[in-house]
């Protein structure tokens, strides 16, 4: 975000010519620096705006559901940011359909701003959640979507078919899960089809 903010400033782009988004969940080690509490959502939004050098975010995602924070608190925090003009729209990422429905019900009951989008993982290897679980929710609430990992962390690009290139994420510490995934029977089965 710092690099992007510097680039936007250097290029002199007018604010009405681009859209920026950010996510909230991860942060520091202290309890007030992570999750979806009201405090962390507001603090993280302000920090993202500072890094991006903008006065507001167009899209702001709850990067993961937070089992330690009531959904109502999260919805209220996002509504606060919308009312303050600091975000235009808010959404979720990797929430269950039940959690999304609950957020909508809370927003409707309390006259708060509901989420407008979900960001699920969606690719040939990860289809069920989007195609079976989310579609009825998206249809009912007219929810938009952006997806993440359309190439399955690079697995579907074909570069891992016969080898594990040393200059890719699969060889990096912390990304072993990608290597396990492309060596799995389910991946091999999809690839062979």
Set out the residue ranges of the language-model regions:
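N-terminal binding-site loop/beta-alpha segment at the start of enzyme catalytic domains
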Residues: 1-19, 55, 83, 165
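Glycine-rich, proline-tolerant flexible connector loops at the mouths of alpha/beta enzymes
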Residues: 1-10, 62-72
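Short amphipathic alpha-helices and their capping/turn segments at secondary-structure boundaries
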Residues: 1-13, 44-50, 134-142
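Short acidic capping loops at alpha-helix termini that bridge into adjacent secondary structure
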Residues: 14-18, 22, 55-59, 88-89, ...
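Active-site-proximal beta-strand/loop segments in catalytic clefts of secreted hydrolases
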Residues: 23-25, 150-151
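A short acidic, helix-capping loop that chelates divalent metal ions and anchors anionic groups
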Residues: 27-33
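Short, acidic/polar
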Residues: 34-53, 71-76, 100-105
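Beta/alpha (TIM)-barrel catalytic core signal, keyed to glycine-rich beta->alpha loops juxtaposed to Asp/Glu
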Residues: 65, 69-193
């Amino acid at each position: 975000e710092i690099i992007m903010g510097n680039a936007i400033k250097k290029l002199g782009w007018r604010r009405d010519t681009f859209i920026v988004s950010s996510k909230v969940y991860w942060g520091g080690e202290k309890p007030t620096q992570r999750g979806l509490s009201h405090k962390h959502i507001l603090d993280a939004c302000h920090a993202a705006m500072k890094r991006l050098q903008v006065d507001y975010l167009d899209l702001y995602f709850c990067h993961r559901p937070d089992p330690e924070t009531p959904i109502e608190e999260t919805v209220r925090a996002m509504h606060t940011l919308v009312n303050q003009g600091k975000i235009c729209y808010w959404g979720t990422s990797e929430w269950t359909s039940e959690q999304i429905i609950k957020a909508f019900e809370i927003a409707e009951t309390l006259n708060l701003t509901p989420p407008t989008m979900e960001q699920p993982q969606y690719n040939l290897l990860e289809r069920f959640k989007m195609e079976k679980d989310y579609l009825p929710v998206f249809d009912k609430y007219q929810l938009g979507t952006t997806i993440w990992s359309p190439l399955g962390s690079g697995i579907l690009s074909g570069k891992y078919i016969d080898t594990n290139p040393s200059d890719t994420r699969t060889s990096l510490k912390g990304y072993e899960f990608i290597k396990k995934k492309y060596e799995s029977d389910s991946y091999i089965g999809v690839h062979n089809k």
